[in-house]
Amino acid sequence: MPSRKTGEIWLAQLDPTVGSEIQKTRPCVVVSPDDMNAHLRTVIVAPMTAGSRPARFRIPLTFQGKQGLILLDQIRTLDGVRLVKRLGALRGPTLAATLQTLQAMFAP
């Protein structure tokens, strides 16, 4: 299984889903810590989308020439087999905003 690092963007198979969970195979940002990723077969990801409304817990970004959002309200744990391929990684301010928003969500 390939290693995954915090901030990497992977194409992930999210189906099957239920109710309001975001679905399909789509880019997702790895948000679990590197030490956790190194020891577990699971990974925590935040899906990305180009078709959603902005909110304080949704981080805007441009990836592969497309405007989109990182949906921190839709984070989930996936088995590593759901990760299809590595597409890239977040950098600088976008990665910092993502991690800061997660911290604010869980440790207000």
Say what each PLM segment does.
Residues M1-P108:
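Conserved functional hotspots at enzyme active or ligand-binding sites that engage polyanionic ligands
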